[in-house]
């Protein structure tokens, strides 16, 4: 680090504000040449020197001051301890020295823990990861929340640190815990657009269906914040990475995530995810990864797999156990077809007008649903091809199906026009038929109106006479 350069800001982590405007700290972490005590110092001057040593990251001076009797858990003006400050700027050496001297790793100030401060520190992920690892090794609780009910994993997810997230989960952090607004770590990562964190959380078993207090899922939060790639990713029905590390022990998870080749492995996982085709996604989601090579060797596509008969499964070497998994998944993926059998039978000559009208209304409603479905697809499809998360088949396949749809819609339009013309013809013939007897509700003659008015008048006059007679008898 360059001498005299500003390293980070000493502010409360995680967006928590301090209780004092004048906290007594020199804000900033400045690299300066190490200093030594010239002799015994008064207590007040010793505390001030201690602050400066922490601010400048002067590890040797901090050790010397601790040796001279200053408390490792000294409380400064707004309640921060030296360890909390060292964690806030991700100074690994200072954190290690203070912990070795007995600093309390579980300290909190107004529910702001040192672990939360470290997870929201200013610094590289490598430095933050080492600080968090040191604190966890001294039994810092990864599930203690701040005043806003945010836990360390939420801060790490919000700030885009996938390795820190994985380390916290390995030490028992709850992946699906929610803060005061219903946000989970996955929601925070989706909101901030951190794809690597989203993938890691899915791998660790994050629930992408949990909703915030205003009823939004992580995918909807991502869409609202214009992170369309993450929105597409979270909208997938099947996820090959979901829960992949959830069943591992803490030691196995740490070993898997923090090996020397962790970065290469991480990049491989992420790139392989984005390169998965529909078939791979389907198989991984069912735990049938072992079938991938077999199906590819036989040039079996997902469409072919989903339409196979039982004898074809056997011919292609798919075991009965695997067949059951595929068939069970097919039932879940089946799209409910429109049940036109429930519509009234219009072929009968004795059908009533109400039944025929009901048939037309239902038919119109189904068409409306189809229009809405197509409109939704048009809205959700990414404009640019590079934003598509999964590999798609050749666009020609989609185009040919769309052309068939257009042709069917044109045929439907033609048939509906014929039906309309036929109904119009029947209506005209009926109106011009001299033998046609109008419905009673259509007849409204002058005589009937006079009769109704007369009846009402007579009844009213009779009621008036009855009232007058009753009044006269009482008198």
UniProtKB/Swiss-Prot annotation:
**SUPFAM superfamilies in UniProt:** Ankyrin repeat, Pseudo ankyrin repeat-like, SAM/Pointed domain
- Reading the lineage from the top rank, the first entry is Eukaryota
This protein's major location comes to cytoplasm
Question: A cellular component term (GO) from this record?
Answer: pi-body
InterPro entries named in the record: Ankyrin_rpt, Ankyrin_rpt-contain_sf, Asz1_SAM, SAM, SAM/pointed_sf
Q: Where in the cell is it found?
A: Cytoplasm
Q: State the UniProt keywords alphabetically.
A: ANK repeat, Cytoplasm, Developmental protein, Differentiation, Meiosis, Phosphoprotein, Repeat, RNA-mediated gene silencing, Spermatogenesis
* Sequence segments annotated as region (Disordered): 1-38
Q: Name one GO biological process term.
A: transposable element silencing
Sites bearing Phosphoserine, chain numbering: 17-18, 20
Q: ANK repeat boundaries?
A: 45-74, 78-107, 110-144, 148-177, 181-210, 214-243
Q: Does the keyword Cytoplasm apply?
A: yes
Where in the numbering of this chain does the SAM domain appear?
272-334
Q: How does it assemble?
A: Interacts with DDX4, PIWIL1, RANBP9 and TDRD1.
> What this chain does, per the record?
Plays a central role during spermatogenesis by repressing transposable elements and preventing their mobilization, which is essential for the germline integrity. Acts via the piRNA metabolic process, which mediates the repression of transposable elements during meiosis by forming complexes composed of piRNAs and Piwi proteins and governs the methylation and subsequent repression of transposons. Its association with pi-bodies suggests a participation in the primary piRNAs metabolic process.
Which protein, by its recorded name, is this? Ankyrin repeat, SAM and basic leucine zipper domain-containing protein 1
Q: What is the lineage of its organism?
A: Eukaryota, Metazoa, Chordata, Craniata, Vertebrata
């Amino acid at each position: 680090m360059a001498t005299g350069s500003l390293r980070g800001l000493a502010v409360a982590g995680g967006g928590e504000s301090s209780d004092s405007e004048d906290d007594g700290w020199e804000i900033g972490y400045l690299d300066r040449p190490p200093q030594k005590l010239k002799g015994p110092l008064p207590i007040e001057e010793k505390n001030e020197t201690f602050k400066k040593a922490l601010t400048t990251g002067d590890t040797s001076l901090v050790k010397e001051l601790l040796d001279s009797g200053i408390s490792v858990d000294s409380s400064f003006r707004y309640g921060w301890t030296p360890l909390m400050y060292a964690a806030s700027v991700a100074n690994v050496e200072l954190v290690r020295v203070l912990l070795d001297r007995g600093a309390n790793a579980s300290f909190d100030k107004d529910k702001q823990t040192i672990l939360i401060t470290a997870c929201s520190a200013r610094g590289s992920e490598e430095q933050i990861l080492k600080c968090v690892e040191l604190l966890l090794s001294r039994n810092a609780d990864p599930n203690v929340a701040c005043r806003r009910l945010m836990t360390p994993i939420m801060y790490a997810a919000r700030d885009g640190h996938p390795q820190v997230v994985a380390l916290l989960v390995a030490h028992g952090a709850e992946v699906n815990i929610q803060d005061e607004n219903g946000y989970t770590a996955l929601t925070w990562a989706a909101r901030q657009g951190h794809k690597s964190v989203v993938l890691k959380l899915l791998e660790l078993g994050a629930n992408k269906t949990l909703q915030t207090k205003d009823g939004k899922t992580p995918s909807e939060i991502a869409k609202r914040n214009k992170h369309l790639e993450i929105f597409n990713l979270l909208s997938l029905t099947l996820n090959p990475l979901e829960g992949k590390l959830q069943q591992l022990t803490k030691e196995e998870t740490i070993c898997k995530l923090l090996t020397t080749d962790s970065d290469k492995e991480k990049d491989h996982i992420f790139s392989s995810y984005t390169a998965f085709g529909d078939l791979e996604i389907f198989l991984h989601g069912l735990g049938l990864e072992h079938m991938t090579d077999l199906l590819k060797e036989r040039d079996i596509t997902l469409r072919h797999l989903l339409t196979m008969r039982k004898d074809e499964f056997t011919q292609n070497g798919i075991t009965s156990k695997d067949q059951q998994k595929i068939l069970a998944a097919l039932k879940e993926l089946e799209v409910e077809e429109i049940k036109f059998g429930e519509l009234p039978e219009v072929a009968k000559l004795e059908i009533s007008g109400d039944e025929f009208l009901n048939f037309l209304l239902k038919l119109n409603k189904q068409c409306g649903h189809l229009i809405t479905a197509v409109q939704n697809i048009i809205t959700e499809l990414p404009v640019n091809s590079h934003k598509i998360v999964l590999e798609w088949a050749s666009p020609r396949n989609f185009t040919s199906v769309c052309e068939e749809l257009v042709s069917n819609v044109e045929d439907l339009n033609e048939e509906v026009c014929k039906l309309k013309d036929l109904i119009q013809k029947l209506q005209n013939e009926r109106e011009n038929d001299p033998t046609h007897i109008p419905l009673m509700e259509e007849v409204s003659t002058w005589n009937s109106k006079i009769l109704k008015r007369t009846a009402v008048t007579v009844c009213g006059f009779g009621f008036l006479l009855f009232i007058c007679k009753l009044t006269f008898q009482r008198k």
